[in-house]
A protein has these predicted regions:
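Membrane-interfacial amphipathic/re-entrant helices at transmembrane-helix boundaries
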Residues: 1-57, 92-107, 335-338
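Inter-helical junctions in multi-pass inner-membrane proteins, predominant
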Residues: 35-45, 92, 150, 156, ...
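Helix-loop-helix "hairpin" substructures at the membrane interface of multi-pass membrane proteins
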Residues: 104-112, 118-123, 175-249
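Transmembrane helix-bundle core of multi-pass membrane transporters
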Residues: 130, 134-196, 223-226, 245-254, ...
């Protein structure tokens, strides 16, 4: 393809439209309140805030690319954070700073990721082997994970972390917020996984046409298991970021992030019927939503009104994608009957 052809292809892509939307929202909010929105404090605050729900959106993205969904991501995030928090408070102690005690921090992170992988394995098994609809399977499992977190903490927050934990969520490395660095690494890793590996091709094939993937000798059950395990580990990573940001862990943190994660994935161009999705689109959608959320916060819009706006926006984006963009974009390929 020529350079001119590549430029034309990009300008017609969903990612280009998202870039325009992100820039438009940024400019609008800047004009609305330039002194507050463009202040260094606000821009830094946004860079610290959005990785929490952005990582959950990555988890939602890979499951939606298979035509499924993972409604348990917030429950997995909180359960993982609670387990890590209990390890840090019961075993490491608040005096941890350097030396051998850092081993407990690594152990807590590893334990949280294992919880996420185990939760993903449960979700993947329910979908792949028991044939449950992903929306129902993960809705039920999410309640179970939240219940486990409540049982482990009695419904109260776990606090008293070592200073290193707060540093991860609230400090910068070479001038870049640590949570933003973590999100960037995870987004890059997921992008490479979906675009540069055979596994990513299988995910796209299965999402576009499960029957064709089966005929192509794709091990569908293995693909689904891996997808939900990856989603679970991404959710655990988000839980660790939330824990370090709040310097505490609780079973009901981030309850508003579920709808936001779904909205970001759909706004980012991920086909909810499966078969298409790009991480760059999700990243641009994250930026758009963060700019909008920050603007609503400056306008002192209540959380309840904000939830209403997210819901209306989700429905609007779905309608636009299914009609204006064309039925073929969001229509799952249907196998034709042989004569």
């Amino acid at each position: 393809m020529t350079v001119q052809g590549q430029k034309m292809s990009f300008t017609r892509s969903p990612e280009f439209r998202l870039l325009i939307i992100a820039c438009a929202v940024f400019v609008f909010m800047s004009l609305l309140s330039p002194d507050r929105f463009l202040s260094g404090q606000n821009l830094t605050s946004m860079a610290f805030q959005f990785p929490e729900f952005a990582i959950l959106a990555l988890a939602m993205t890979i499951t939606m690319m298979t035509g499924g969904i993972d409604l348990s991501v917030v429950g997995v995030a909180n359960l993982s954070a609670v387990v890590a928090a209990l390890i840090l408070t019961q075993l490491a102690g608040p005096e941890m700073a350097t030396g051998p005690s850092l081993i407990w921090l690594g152990f807590a992170v590893a334990a949280a990721l294992c919880i996420g992988a185990a939760a993903g394995l449960v979700n993947g098994s329910l979908v792949a082997f028991f044939g449950l609809p992903p929306i129902l399977a993960t809705l039920g499992s999410g309640l179970v994970f939240t219940g486990l977190a409540i049982a482990m903490t009695g419904g109260s927050a776990v606090m008293g972390f070592p200073a290193t934990v707060a540093w991860i969520g609230n400090e910068s490395l070479l001038g870049v917020p640590v949570p933003l660095i973590l999100f960037g690494l995870l987004a890059l890793g997921l992008h490479l996984l979906l675009t540069k590996t055979a596994f990513g091709l299988r995910v796209t094939m299965y999402g576009a046409n499960p029957l064709a993937a089966l005929y192509a000798a794709v091990n569908i059950n293995r693909v689904l298991l891996k997808v939900y395990v990856i989603a679970g580990m991404l959710a655990s990573s988000a839980g660790l970021v939330i824990m370090s940001r709040a310097n505490s862990a609780k079973a009901d943190y981030g309850s508003s992030y579920l709808l936001l994660a779904v909205l970001i994935a759909v706004l980012g161009g991920v086909n909810p019927y499966g078969g298409y999705g790009r991480v760059i689109g999700v990243v641009l959608a994250v930026l758009s939503m963060q700019f909008l959320s920050s603007g609503l916060n400056m306008l002192q819009v209540s959380n309840f009104a904000r939830e209403l706006i997210w819901g209306v926006l989700l429905i609007f984006v779905m309608v636009i994608n299914s009609n204006a963009i064309g039925r073929g974009f969001f229509a799952r390929a249907k196998p034709t009957k042989s004569s």
